[in-house]
Each structure stands twice: as C-alpha cells, then as structure tokens.
Amino acid sequence: MNLKKLWFTIEKLLQTTKGNKMKISEEGKALIKRFEGCKLEAYLCPANKWTIAYGRIKDVKEGDTCTQEQAEKWLDEELEEYEGYVENAVKLPLSQCQFDALVAWTYNLGPTNLSSSTMLKCLNKAEFDRVPSEIKRWNKAGGEVLDGLIRRREAEALLFQGKDWHEV
C-alpha cells in the first residue's frame, strides 16, 4: 500500500462509525429524493419496471397508488435494507459521505450490481481515488445512456468525495 492510500485509509478510519451500524444521513436521503422524485401513481421507469413513490419497485403493479406518507415510510424502510447491503459488502471503514453515496448508488442499481462491481473491488482494496470514476460508469438503463443517470452518478461521485453535489 503506498503512502497516499495509507494516509487516506487512516483519515477515513478517524471519520467513520464502522463497528456501529451506519445510517444514511439527511444529505444522502436528499440526493435520493431529488433524483428518484416522488410519484404517487405507478409508472414504468426507463428500465421498464413498474415503479412508485421514491423509486420503489417491490410489489408494484400498473394502477397502484400511494399517499405521500406511505412513500416516505417505504423509503425509510427500504433505505434501512440498502444500508445493510452496503455495510455487508464494504469491508473497510467509510466516512458518512462515502456511505451516503454508496447507499444512494445501491438504492438505484441494486445489491447485485454492487456485489459484482469493480467499484466494490476498488473500495475493498482501499483504492478510494478510483471509486468516483467507477460510480460514473453506471449511466445506462435498458442499454441506453441517460442524461438523468449521468447527472445522478456525478452527484453520487461528488458526495462520495465530500463535495457539494447540489449544482449537478
């Protein structure tokens, strides 16, 4: 491990809560809400899946509706699940902003993509400097590059680095 990677790892160890269950922050949740949007009626997303609320696909069918209160509840429940996926997959400590970005990414792309990604391999080898570019590679739905996914991945990459993502 080179000195730069060692220092970065030490710095992140000092900023982390690894060992305690990490929770997504309001900042991470805001990123998800912004890019998912909230729709109270089921719709077909670009990946051709029935979706409702803040990107919920579980048990959704055409014609389904929900209230804003239900959408918020579902998001909180699902985020707890996705926090667990990230916690279990990443073997090194993370800062809050890194954790938030990874939960947002995994919420959008799913735990299977996380577990098979080069991004995860980079994370677990402490190659944190490679992660932002790996985040950005995932900009397609249905085989097509989408402007919305380009912006979302840019925002997640910035958040991962602890930078302001709001202007993306």
Summary of predicted features, one role per range:
Residues I32, Q98-T106, E134-K136:
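Short alpha-helical scaffolding segments that buttress acidic/His motifs in well-ordered protein cores
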Residues N2-A47, Y54-K61, C66-G84, L92-P93, ...:
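Long, amphipathic alpha-helical surface segments
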Residues N88-F99:
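Short, structured surface segments that line ligand/substrate-binding pockets
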